[in-house]
Amino acid sequence: MKHAENEYLNLCRHVMEHGTKKEDRTGTGTVSVFGYQMRFDLSKGFPLLTTKRVPFRLVASELLWFMKGDTNIRYLLQHNNNIWNEWAFKSWVESDEYTGPDMTDFGLRSQQDEEFKVQYDEQMELFKKNVLEDDEFSNKYGYLGDVYGKQWRAWKTTAGETLDQLKDVIEMIKKTPDSRRLIVSAWNPEDVPSMALPPCHTLFQFYVADGKLSCQLYQRSGDIFLGIPFNIASYSLLTHLIAHECGLEVGEFVHTIGDAHIYTNHFEQVEKQLAREPRPFPKLTLNPDVKSVFDFEMEDLTIEGYDPHPAIKAPVAV
């Protein structure tokens, strides 16, 4: 029987073989295709990739951060999650208050220059310490703009009010499960210019049939090697959490990607991953005593039977 992970591995193969070479804002370069869809049956295991280790702890803490409506990296740092650091760090080193060594193009330079990487690591550690310990600094430089959490939980209206899209969609699933309006959008054109990183996963929609909750994500831009594995796990987890509160079983996670790309400096890593055989997906267990999605904490989420191949490191394009 075909392993569900092949949905992802086939995406990698397709882009490597048929992708178009493109330039990008990071200066790294990509190969990409436009318009690709994957489907995962969530009743047959939790789609945490096994051909390389994907850290569930980071996936879960980021999702809980989104769901809290938080847009400051302090919560993530408190949970030893560093995946958003570079975007906050960028605003700090480009500010008038920063007086340390030149950090221009730190993403690329830290990969190419060992001496610079030492300086970069020192400045990043100092930055993280300040975000964790200095409230004023954290409020100013730990803040990422009105990114996912703000749009999900406090979308600004023209009337000066806010909409809690996530809370509203959960209530709609309970009351009108056949609605075709079970949608949450993170793409707010007015706020995009002030965001540290405009939303890559832009809109998601729920669908209820036969007592099962399915979710489809539209992602405008997907970093196939580093980002997409996180996105698959994150929205699968979100579907489980909402199904749990609504008294539903899980159905499918459908992942639709606009610009699906592999960075040129990830080719070697992708080839290494494609040479590996998938292993059985793990099982996700939720604390049955927690009833609301907004009350879940890290200790309420458990992954069992996860036996992946080793992690494969790759640089992040900032």
Swiss-Prot record:
Keywords: Cytoplasm, Methyltransferase, Nucleotide biosynthesis, Transferase. The keyword Transferase applies. GO terms for cellular component: cytosol. It is an enzyme of class 2 (transferase). (6R)-5,10-methylene-5,6,7,8-tetrahydrofolate binds at residues 223, 317. Its main location: cytoplasm. Its EC number is 2.1.1.45. It comes from the Bacteria. It catalyses: dUMP + (6R)-5,10-methylene-5,6,7,8-tetrahydrofolate = 7,8-dihydrofolate + dTMP. One of its GO terms (molecular function) is thymidylate synthase activity. It is found in: Cytoplasm. NCBIfam families: PRK01827.1-2, thym_sym. Belongs to the thymidylate synthase family. Bacterial-type ThyA subfamily. Homodimer. This is Thymidylate synthase.
